[in-house]
């Protein structure tokens, strides 16, 4: 979690800062220097910045939604929300195949087609395992609070959920020569604009 927590700082679509610059900014603040000294016994650095972010992320509560109320028989979904739920768990959108459990993820590594060995050249899990069939695989993210966590995908290439769905509707239109795309994603979803 600590390693992951620094990614949004470096990501140009989020904070777009070098970690060193983020640490420099923290050290320029008397308040943050005092807080880091109190908690970590030293001034801010990359290691304790990651630890602070990870500790914060562990406090986030994400299971208090209307869907949670519905699943615990504490509330009802509107007709539109129920249609969305049916799409999510059904055979047309197939979201539930990869996004299930409490956090809407299986925590499995999948290649959703965002790897072509050229422009999209982050090989994902392959960088660790060196197994050819792991090229382009990334851990399936949870979808809790997904509406407020843009940008999307491991590389932040989609700015809106509509762009994400457009990709799943026509993946070959976005990336012609995807390498090792998961079989479950080789057929476009063909969702309508209303869906």
Task: Give residue spans per PLM region.
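Periplasmic c-type cytochrome electron-transfer domains
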Residues: 1-195
């Amino acid at each position: 979690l600590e390693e992951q927590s620094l990614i949004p700082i470096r990501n140009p679509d989020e904070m777009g800062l070098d970690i060193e610059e983020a640490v420099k900014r923290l050290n320029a603040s008397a308040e943050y220097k005092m807080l880091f000294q109190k908690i970590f016994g030293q001034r801010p650095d990359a290691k304790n910045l990651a630890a602070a972010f990870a500790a914060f992320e562990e406090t986030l509560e994400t299971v208090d939604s209307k869907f949670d109320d519905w699943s615990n028989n504490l509330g009802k979904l509107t007709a539109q929300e129920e249609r969305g739920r049916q799409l999510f768990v059904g055979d047309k959108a197939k979201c539930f195949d990869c996004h299930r459990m409490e956090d809407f993820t299986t925590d499995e590594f999948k290649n959703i087609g965002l790897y072509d060995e050229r422009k999209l050249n982050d090989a994902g899990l392959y960088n660790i395992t060196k197994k050819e069939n792991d090229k382009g695989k990334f851990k399936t993210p949870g979808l809790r609070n997904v509406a407020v966590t843009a940008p999307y995908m491991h590389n932040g290439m989609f700015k809106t959920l509509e762009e994400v769905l457009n990709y799943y509707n026509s993946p070959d239109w976005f990336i012609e020569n995807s390498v090792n795309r998961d079989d479950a994603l080789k057929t476009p979803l063909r969702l309508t604009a209303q869906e």
